[in-house]
Amino acid sequence: MHEMSITQSVVEICTQNAGGRRVTAVILEIGDLSGVVPDAIEFCFEACTRDTQLDGARLLIERVQALGRCRDCKAEFALSAYYDPCPACGGFGVDVLSGEELRVKELEVE
């Protein structure tokens, strides 16, 4: 489960940016194409934050919808996978606009 190491990295990032203060909430953005399972992150969060500045902090996960733009017709549309064809023209040349995110968006500290 790579979500455990991802969650450990999230805790490290939060600790480094909290300035020694206790963290009460973490807002994490996870894109639909990131390959990260939000439920697994939630499961790992309590174990990874125990006895740290984040102990007892709330984890709020914001899902980021995957969006793409067709290189041929320039249509923008929701993606469910990397290789979805354009629904407007059927083209497979699609640029991902969003949905790959995995970032700490915000920290609440005391």
UniProtKB/Swiss-Prot annotation:
Annotated GO biological process: protein maturation; protein modification process
Alphabetic keyword roster: Metal-binding, Nickel, Zinc
Positions with a binding annotation for Zn(2+): 70, 73, 86, 89
Domain of life: Bacteria
An example Gene Ontology molecular-function term: nickel cation binding
Positions of Ni(2+) binding: 2
Gene3D superfamilies: 3.30.2320.80
Described purpose of this protein according to its UniProt entry: Involved in the maturation of [NiFe] hydrogenases. Required for nickel insertion into the metal center of the hydrogenase.
Entry similarity comment: Belongs to the HypA/HybF family.
HAMAP family per record: HypA_HybF (MF_00213)
PANTHER family named among the record's database cross-references: HYDROGENASE MATURATION FACTOR HYPA (PTHR34535:SF3)
Protein name per the record: Hydrogenase maturation factor HypA
Species assigned in the record: Geotalea uraniireducens (strain Rf4) (Geobacter uraniireducens)
